[in-house]
């Protein structure tokens, strides 16, 4: 196997994110009805309560916390906290649906070089943060080397011409 300095582990994609939860059923309901994931078969050899879901090219593995009462309580929505982010087709549609479902969210905005990225942040039932954005409009510019076209089209082995380096100058959080 030829060594690749830019990808030493020869990774190909993100497979799944595991999330500890108080109630597997409640979390499954959220990930299905709010984010559109579907339940998939989970190996029977896993001898603990959990569920696997799949959607948008990745898996979500829900793991029932052994001591649910010790999981951190939901806190204020903080866009700078750990989270997973999903690209969407229409921020307006997402915001309307969140309001219809009674889900509290925080809106944020990133502006860079005339490009505006809208972000919505909210929690799952256990306080794990979810971001929905239109981040695909923001180019992915490595600090060294070549530039990828955008978030959804990144292929490390097929990057395009080098671009001038820029940094995000302003991040506006409510």
UniProtKB/Swiss-Prot annotation:
VOC domain location: 13-135
Residues annotated as the enzyme's active site: 131
Tissues expressed in: Mostly expressed in roots, and, to a lower extent, in leaves, flowers, seeds and siliques.
Name of the featured protein: Glyoxylase I 4
Deletion phenotype: General stress phenotype, characterized by compromised methylglyoxal (MG) scavenging, accumulation of reactive oxygen species (ROS), stomatal closure, and reduced fitness associated with reduced leaf area and dry weight, as well as prolonged flowering time. Increased susceptibility to the pathogenic fungus Plectospherella cucumerina which triggers mainly the jasmonate (JA)-mediated defense signaling pathway. Abnormal cross-talk between salicylic acid (SA) and jasmonic acid (JA) signaling pathways.
Induction cue: Accumulates in response to abiotic stresses such as cold, heat, drought, oxidative stress, genotoxic compounds, wounding, osmotic stress and UV-B. Slightly induced by salt (NaCl) and nickel ions Ni(2+). Strongly induced by methylglyoxal (MG).
Keywords linked to the UniProt accession: Cell membrane, Cytoplasm, Lyase, Membrane, Plant defense, Stress response
Compartments, as annotated in UniProt: Cell membrane; Cytoplasm
Pfam families with a match to the protein in the record: Glyoxalase
One of the record's GO cellular component terms: cytoplasm
UniProt family annotation: Belongs to the glyoxalase I family.
Originating gene: GLYI4
Entry GO MF terms: lyase activity
Segment forming the signal sequence: none
Stored InterPro entries: Glyas_Bleomycin-R_OHBP_Dase, Glyas_Fos-R_dOase_dom, VOC
GO biological process: cellular detoxification of methylglyoxal; defense response; regulation of abscisic acid-activated signaling pathway; regulation of jasmonic acid mediated signaling pathway; regulation of salicylic acid mediated signaling pathway; response to cold; response to heat; response to jasmonic acid
Organism: Arabidopsis thaliana (Mouse-ear cress)
Protein function: Involved in the detoxification and scavenging of methylglyoxal (MG), a cytotoxic aldehyde produced in response to primary metabolism alteration observed during biotic and abiotic stresses. Modulates cross-talk between salicylic acid (SA) and jasmonic acid (JA) signaling pathways during defense responses to pathogens such as Botrytis cinerea.
């Amino acid at each position: 196997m030829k060594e690749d300095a830019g990808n030493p582990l020869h990774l190909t994609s993100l497979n799944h994110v595991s999330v500890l939860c108080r109630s597997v059923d409640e979390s499954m309901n959220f990930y299905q009805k709010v984010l559109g994931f579907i339940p998939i078969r989970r190996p029977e050899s896993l001898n603990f309560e959990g569920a696997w879901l799949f959607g948008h090219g990745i898996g979500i593995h829900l793991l029932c916390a052994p001591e649910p009462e010790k999981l951190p309580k939901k806190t204020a929505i903080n866009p700078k906290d750990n989270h997973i982010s999903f690209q969407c087709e229409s921020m307006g549609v997402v915001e309307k649906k969140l309001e219809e479902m009674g889900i509290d969210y925080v809106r944020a905005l990133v502006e860079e070089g005339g490009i505006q990225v809208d972000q919505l942040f909210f929690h799952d039932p256990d306080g794990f943060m979810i971001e929905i954005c239109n981040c695909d409009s923001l180019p992915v510019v490595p600090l060294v080397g070549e530039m990828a076209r955008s978030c959804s089209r990144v292929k490390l082995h097929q990057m395009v011409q080098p671009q001038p380096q820029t940094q995000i100058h302003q991040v506006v959080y409510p």
